[in-house]
């Protein structure tokens, strides 16, 4: 497990991201796609049920041994919490209540955040806007690994460790790459999360807190669902920077696998993204795609051509509202 990844730098390009032009072409050809730009009527009920399931799980694990607690945190809680982060991703595009109810979407994302254990939703939204606007943008898109990550995590063993540590890199990277002022909503997110955690601790002790945090750290680390982190934008085929996954795990991840469709139309909820492909199959069926997130993780670790450097990067001009 000692072979180093072949890449020593990112894949630098000097063209704009492809999704803006694709969006214009597709809307001109298929105006019916605009009808999909509406709230998802199911997500608020699905998310509410998931939050309640995790609260019930907190009660159930209060008497478990530590070994079994960690097992269930990975096998069950990890799936729920990772899925909740993907619900938060969807809600960050105002898909729960529509663009006319921005505040309600933000507060609902904070509610979905509760089982995660740490405040996350508001900060995610702040940076995710840049990910779409400046896809691959140097110093702007914090989804891109740092140069240190690309340089150090270059062997199979180190890439495996990098996957395990994904929650930490996704949390800390924005502070290093593109630090921003803490907003009032982020403070409120933290206070609500603290109140929830203190309440759970007061009711049932430390084990439920460890369960929730373990569910997040284990579920977002080396876990089958975490294949989407790599599948979405890591360059498995030169010249392609966004990939869709068409496999069964879309059922429990709010269709995050339909990632080419999502970047083409960020305002369409995950629930409706399969319809985009159905309406305009010629824009998607011929593109490289994934069918197994586990295989994605395996290939990322053991293919010498893959590593944190396997990302398309570009210089982007700041939009006027960023100046």
Curated annotation (Swiss-Prot):
Motif (Histidine box-2): 128-132
Record motif Histidine box-3, residues: 259-263
Pfam families tied to this protein: FA_desaturase, Lipid_DES
Bilayer-crossing regions: 41-61, 68-88, 210-231
UniProt cross-references to InterPro entries, sorted A to Z: DES1/DES2, FA_desaturase_dom, Sphingolipid_d4-desaturase_N
Membrane topology, from the record: Multi-pass membrane protein
Covalently attached lipid (N-myristoyl glycine), positions: 2
PANTHER family in the cross-refs: SPHINGOLIPID DELTA 4 DESATURASE/C-4 HYDROXYLASE PROTEIN DES2, SPHINGOLIPID DELTA(4)-DESATURASE_C4-MONOOXYGENASE DES2
Protein name: Sphingolipid delta(4)-desaturase/C4-monooxygenase DES2
Organism: Mus musculus (Mouse)
């Amino acid at each position: 497990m000692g072979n180093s990844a072949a890449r020593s730098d990112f894949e630098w390009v000097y063209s704009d991201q492809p999704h803006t032009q694709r969006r214009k072409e597709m809307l001109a050809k298929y105006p019916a796609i605009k009808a999909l730009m509406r709230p998802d009527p199911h997500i608020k009920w699905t998310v509410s049920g998931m939050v309640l399931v995790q609260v019930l799980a907190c009660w159930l694990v209060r008497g478990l041994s530590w070994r079994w607690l960690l097992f269930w945190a990975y096998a069950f809680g990890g799936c729920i919490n990772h899925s909740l982060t993907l619900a938060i991703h969807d809600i960050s595009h105002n898909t729960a209540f529509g663009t006319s109810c921005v505040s309600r979407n933000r507060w609902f994302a904070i509610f979905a955040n509760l089982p995660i254990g740490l405040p996350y939703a508001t900060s995610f939204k702040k940076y995710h806007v840049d990910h779409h606007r400046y896809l691959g943008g140097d110093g702007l898109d914090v989804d891109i690994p740092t140069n240190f990550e690309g340089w150090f995590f270059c062997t199979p063993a180190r890439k495996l460790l990098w996957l395990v540590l994904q929650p930490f890199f996704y949390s800390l990277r924005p502070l290093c790459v593109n630090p921003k002022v803490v907003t009032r909503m982020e403070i409120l997110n933290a206070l609500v999360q603290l109140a929830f955690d203190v309440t759970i601790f007061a009711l049932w002790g430390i084990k439920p807190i460890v369960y929730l945090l373990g569910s997040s750290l284990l579920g977002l680390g080396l876990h089958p669902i975490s294949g989407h982190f790599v599948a979405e934008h890591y360059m498995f085929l030169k010249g392609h920077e966004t990939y869709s996954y068409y496999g069964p795990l879309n059922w429990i991840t709010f269709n995050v696998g339909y990632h080419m469709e999502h970047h083409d139309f960020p305002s369409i909820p995950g629930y409706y993204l399969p319809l985009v492909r159905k309406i305009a199959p010629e824009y998607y069926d011929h593109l490289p795609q994934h069918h197994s997130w586990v295989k994605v993780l395996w290939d990322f670790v053991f293919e010498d051509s893959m590593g944190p450097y396997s990302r398309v990067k570009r210089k982007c001009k700041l939009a006027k509202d960023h100046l």
